[in-house]
Design a protein with these regions (language model features):
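Gram-negative outer-membrane assembly/targeting C-terminal domains
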Residues: 157-184
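Beta-lactam-recognizing serine transpeptidase/beta-lactamase-like catalytic domain environment
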Residues: 1-141, 175-184
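Short amphipathic alpha-helical signal-transduction/dimerization elements
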Residues: 39, 86, 150-161
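Charged/polar, solvent-exposed surface patches and flexible loops
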Residues: 76-80, 84, 151, 155, ...
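Short, charged, low-complexity patches
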Residues: 31, 141-154
């Protein structure tokens, strides 16, 4: 950041960066791992593709818990806020009956249409999944990222979609997303 701002950080720079604007760069995998860290109240496991290799030991780098320097009690506050976002905030479309989903929307500004972003995890107190969804050029995080993330979490956690969710999934499959165009 010092290179980008030539050492001239100010209050506006800090505010802008704190909401993810400016030079904040993170991949969807990094955002999902952040969600996993919040879900686990302060630890994550290094993302990896291979779960096991027959008759082989996986390097402990990929199986051990890596703890942050932030106390678990602080993550609880963040998780509660993310739960409230699903109950009564911008993540309401992430509600899945019988599952306590926690989430956070995002809208990544772009030269064209904004990108719809969602980060979430579930269940709140015994997390099984953390997810990040980016849908380019479609607008607010609540428009696409949240409902698509909820569908993916429901499928993963329940092994299937409810009839209502199946209809929603079909509707999103039929929508035209105008990548790279000024029209929606």
């Amino acid at each position: 950041y010092d290179k980008a701002y030539r050492g001239s950080w100010n209050g506006l720079t800090v505010i802008s960066i704190s909401i993810g604007q400016g030079e904040v760069n993170a991949t969807p995998l990094q955002i999902a791992n952040l969600g996993a860290t919040i879900a686990n109240r302060g630890y994550f496991i290094t993302p990896h593709v291979v779960k096991q290799i027959q008759d082989e030991q996986i390097d402990t780098l990929y199986t051990r818990r890596r703890y942050t320097m932030v106390e678990a009690r602080h993550y609880e506050t963040v998780a509660q806020g993310m739960r409230r976002a699903v109950l009564a905030g911008t993540c309401r479309k992430a509600n899945i009956p019988g599952i306590e989903v926690c989430g956070k929307t995002g809208t990544a500004q772009n030269r064209g249409h904004d990108h719809s972003v969602f980060m979430g995890f579930a269940p709140m107190n015994e997390p099984k999944i953390a997810i990040a969804v980016y849908v380019e050029n479609v607008g607010w995080g609540a428009d696409y990222g949240v409902p698509l993330g909820a569908l993916m979490m429901e499928q993963y956690l329940n092994g299937k979609l409810s009839p209502e969710s199946e209809k929603l999934a079909e509707m999103y499959q039929q929508r035209h997303i105008g990548y790279g165009t000024a029209d929606r």
